[in-house]
A protein has these predicted regions:
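Helix-loop segments that flank and shape redox-cofactor active sites
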Residues: 8-15, 30-55
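Glycine-rich, flexible loop/turn motifs
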Residues: 2-4, 37, 42, 81, ...
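N-terminal intrinsically disordered, cationic/polar leader segments
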Residues: 24, 77-91
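A generic "alpha-helical surface" signal
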Residues: 18-21, 25, 51, 58
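Disorder-to-helix initiation segments
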Residues: 2-23
């Protein structure tokens, strides 16, 4: 972890990065699941559900990016592998 002077101890920053990586992992896996449903939706409500799921995964993408960037700003490293996502995820 690189040194960052933002008024938090290294322990506090490490704890925050750990939590952010958990959020990042859950968000990424949720995005994958949402895209899968988006691709597979059928039926009379196809258009509205398809659009809703697209909006959701686009919002998740923004959240994922912000979470990863915040982790870096705290001096940590955002998880970025399938193995890492599965390690930290709770969904």
């Amino acid at each position: 972890m690189r040194k960052v002077n933002i008024g938090l101890t290294q322990e506090q920053r490490q704890g925050s990065c750990e939590l952010l990586n958990r959020v990042l992992s859950d968000s990424y896996l949720l995005q994958i699941k949402t895209k899968k449903y988006h691709w597979d939706v059928t039926g009379p409500e196809f258009r509205s559900i398809h659009q809703l799921l697209q909006e959701q995964y686009e919002m998740l993408d923004e959240n994922i990016d912000a979470t990863a960037e915040r982790t870096r700003a705290l001096g940590g490293f955002p998880v970025g592998t399938a193995e890492g996502f599965l390690k930290y995820a709770s969904i």
